[in-house]
Amino acid sequence: TIVECNTAYEGARNTTEKHLKLLKHHRWLDVYPVDLLDAEGPDMVLDIKKHKIIDKNYVGKDLAKYDSMLVLSHFKGHAMGGYGGALKQLSIGVASSYGKAYIHGSGDPSKIWTGNHDTFLESMADAAGSVIDYFGGNMAFINVMKNLSVDCDCSAVAEPPCMKDIGILVSTDPVAVDQACLDLVYAATEDPGQAHLIERIESRHGVHTIEAAAELGLGSREYELIEIE
């Protein structure tokens, strides 16, 4: 089952009705069972045991149907987070529409676009931790480093990819897999688009989400990279 939640911003996915219409348009419903976790309320509220900013996380109530999760993320740049990967998918991706605004506003949904930036990044780490705790470690993470644009897929008009495809990373540690992706971007010194993506990551202090997640004990920034041809 593919799981998804509604967005917190205007567009084709901010209501259940519009989201289902888009899924039908792209024929997802012809191929996969899709569960919009927050299609119906009320939200499930997860307590965050160890946190920096927020102490609760609002997720779609249908999360209660599942006891494990395979987190598939398109690794790329992001206009607010600097980059998007496993940690963002765990937090913003699993959060309900209200929960997304709550994380962006560091606990104040009314500040979804105006809150302190670093506390937003730390709130993402907080929220990610609550989902990890909920599943008790029954999780795996796949980051796809393909079509590497500075923009998220959620952008109405995303900038074309600026770097060559790098590969697909798999881990049971969301911190390690995101850190490895960043390291591979920095290692691609001969790619003419590298500087553009790094500028997006650094200008938004993207690494801070990884720093916060590691400090919260969600995983390790140290890893062994095993390459499979």
What are these model-predicted stretches?
Residues 1-229:
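Extended, low-polarity segments enriched in aliphatic/aromatic residues
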